[in-house]
A protein has these predicted regions:
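Catalytic histidine-centered segment of alpha/beta-hydrolase-like enzymes
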Residues: 113-127
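Short beta-strand/loop motif that positions the catalytic acidic residue
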Residues: 72-74, 79-81, 85
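Alpha/beta-hydrolase-fold serine-hydrolase catalytic core, especially in secreted/extracellular enzymes
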Residues: 135-149
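Hydrolase active-site cap/lid region
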Residues: 5-60, 68
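Catalytic histidine neighborhood in serine/cysteine hydrolases
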Residues: 98-117
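Acidic catalytic loop of the alpha/beta-hydrolase fold
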Residues: 84-88, 116-117
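Short alpha-helix in the alpha/beta-hydrolase fold that links the catalytic acid
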Residues: 66, 75, 89-98
Length: 149
């Protein structure tokens, strides 16, 4: 989620793409999802969690939203998510993918992978997808650099 939010910011020229692995859509939604998972009334308690974050943490969970950043992202983005992720729902990556404004994007769902485990679950497939996705991007960056010398 952090790299998705950073992708909407002004970044150095050497940042040529984003690998978003099992990112959530918003801090608010992931907090509420976890609350529901532990059988707490999320809609009732979330305002208190938000207040606590503002008072004790110095931040507003409603202010951080990867999906909103995706609407401004122009960098190439490859989204990975495991279909067995029981922490961040796979649908959140689908929503982030749909919201992404980049013309060069791809969503890879890894069968049987839990949260953050796409790479260990399918190393070969992960490498292949990364190579296929970023090779054209990196090739154009290399040719741009050689033309400027």
């Amino acid at each position: 989620a952090t790299v998705m939010m950073a992708s909407a910011e002004k970044l150095p020229a050497n940042v040529v793409g984003v690998l978003a692995d099992c990112g959530y859509t918003s801090t608010r939604e992931i907090i509420k999802k976890v609350m529901r998972d532990i059988k707490l009334p999320a809609n009732l308690l979330y305002p208190f969690v938000r207040l606590g974050a503002r008072i004790f943490g110095g931040f507003d969970p409603d202010a951080s939203s990867p999906i909103e950043s995706m609407k401004k992202c122009k960098l190439p983005v490859i989204f990975y998510h495991g279909d067995a992720d029981d922490f961040v729902p796979c649908d959140m990556s689908r929503e982030n993918y749909e919201a992404c404004a980049s013309e060069h994007k791809r969503l890879v769902i890894t069968e049987g992978a839990g949260h953050g485990l796409c790479f260990p679950r399918d190393r070969h497939g992960y490498y292949i997808a990364l190579d296929e996705f970023f090779r054209p991007v990196l090739s154009s960056q290399t040719s741009d650099l050689s033309q400027n010398q």
